[in-house]
């Protein structure tokens, strides 16, 4: 019964999200467009999700064409809405911004709707990743049994609504996911793998068990207070650096989707200056400031697990 209730909540939450996104699309379409600039990125083909991205060619859309692309993007939730060659495991990214003139009622309604949408997205992600109780390897099959073709990364992605920015500049960010762990944390993680042996990456169960045992012994030999961390690179991401003139501050936002910019003209909101997103070339990245990296010792390459001094 509990599993049935969870599936019911999954479906109800998704339908509410789908309806709210269409309401947002229609609400924005009713507003007066001031400016729009979005940047299409190349499709990620099936089987190439984990290939390193050394270059990214950007195609720009402006004005009405950009607005239409942005509104389609916000409701792009299923693989049936895209090319058969495009991977369903890679989220579709469309950095940029769409700027609308709004009055008091529109401003309040759009902010309230965005808050509702983002709450539903969080709720949907919680149902799938936590309440289902399923490991990541089994979630895909479970979700697609009830919502065939759903691109979960697109469904989870939150909307970003900005008020009266002065300028928007776009660029690329190279980041790492860093998670600090204790020795006992890692040992517990490896123990779970030892208790459920399986064939992985061309290795037999016995070979995989032997590898896990060696990894366990290497970690167990460290002092109990050893500082361990997972430092895993993530693919280069588009970002927006937004300047707010009224309070003289700059804020950086992740920008996988178009920023929704509301210009409240009666409150001094003018059309912002929207910059360009240039092509990405890994060999020509220039860092404004690159702090000295901490010297780390690799412990388990497959986990990106390091020993910190």
Curated annotation (Swiss-Prot):
Family matches, as Pfam families: Ter
Single biological process term from Gene Ontology: DNA replication termination
Keywords: Cytoplasm, DNA replication, DNA-binding
Subcellular localization: Cytoplasm
InterPro entries, sorted: DNA_replication_term_site-bd, Tus_dom1, Tus_sf
Entries under SUPFAM superfamilies matching the protein: Replication terminator protein (Tus)
Gene Ontology MF, one: DNA binding
A GO cellular component entry from the record: cytoplasm
Family to which the UniProt record says this protein belongs: Belongs to the Tus family.
Function of the molecule: Trans-acting protein required for termination of DNA replication. Binds to DNA replication terminator sequences (terA to terF) to prevent the passage of replication forks. The termination efficiency will be affected by the affinity of this protein for the terminator sequence.
Protein name (database record): DNA replication terminus site-binding protein
Species, as recorded: Cronobacter sakazakii (strain ATCC BAA-894)
